């Protein structure tokens, strides 16, 4: 079980992650697509499903325009409430720093979250660079078996989402069935033509 600061003690009999065959590295899934296509909803459902299967999972909600942590569950069900901004603003991001700033859900033992809080935006904290985003992802892999990253739609201006798309083990690409989504893909897919984006890992 994830054992972050502020976490209440639970019975030891129910505190172990279900064993898996062989040792495997942490898996990172980035969820990306057009605005309003349900990225956050799907990210939350996947994270909750894994947690209910007793898999350690960290859900990262990268949106700094509309902080979603207050929208996905009542704040009184959370503890150790800190902001993703605290992590990304640090000159050097470590596993310990990430662990200290993870939000813990009181009722879902295997789930931890990171995201911006109500009233915050991209200017609330010091700006960060791709190097910090890479350190952040590396630290997440050390902390949990599964990492779900709810990416922002506008990757040209969202460093964390862009780095997540490049570094994730798989990318779930989502769109709505409407003209707005078609226009979105026509605008954004040309940005992903370079090999570094590894579009062959995109699940559509």
Regions found by a protein language model. Name each.
Residues 20-65, 69, 140:
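Walker A/P-loop phosphate-binding motif and the immediately C-terminal alpha-helix
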Residues 1-28, 77, 87-96, 183, ...:
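Acidic-aromatic/histidine active-site loop/patch
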Residues 135, 142, 146, 151-204:
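Conserved catalytic-core segment of NTP-binding enzymes
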Residues 29, 58-60, 112-114, 170-172, ...:
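Hydrophobic/aromatic beta-strand patches that form the interior of the parallel beta-sheet core
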Residues 53, 57-112:
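Phosphate-binding loop that captures ATP/GTP phosphates
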Residues 94-107, 112-157:
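Cytosolic-facing regulatory segments adjacent to core modules
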């Amino acid at each position: 079980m994830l054992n972050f600061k502020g976490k209440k003690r639970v019975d030891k009999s129910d505190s172990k992650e279900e064993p898996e065959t062989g040792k495997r590295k942490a898996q990172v899934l980035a969820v990306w697509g057009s605005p309003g296509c349900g990225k956050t909803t799907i990210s939350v459902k996947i994270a909750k499903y894994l947690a209910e299967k007793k898999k350690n999972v960290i859900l990262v909600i990268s949106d700094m325009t509309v902080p979603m942590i207050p929208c996905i569950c009542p704040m009184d069900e959370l503890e150790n409430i800190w902001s993703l901004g605290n992590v990304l603003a640090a000159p050097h991001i470590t596993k310990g720093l990430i662990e200290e700033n993870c939000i813990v859900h009181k009722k879902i033992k295997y789930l931890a979250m990171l995201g911006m809080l109500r009233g915050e935006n991209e200017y609330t904290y010091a700006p960060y660079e791709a190097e910090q985003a890479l350190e952040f992802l590396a630290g997440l892999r050390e902390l949990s078996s599964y990492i779900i990253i709810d990416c922002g739609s506008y990757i040209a201006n969202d460093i964390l989402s862009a780095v997540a798309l490049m570094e994730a083990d798989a990318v779930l690409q989502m769109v709505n069935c409407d003209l707005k989504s078609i226009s979105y893909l026509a605008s954004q897919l040309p940005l992903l033509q370079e090999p570094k984006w590894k579009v062959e890992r995109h699940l559509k």
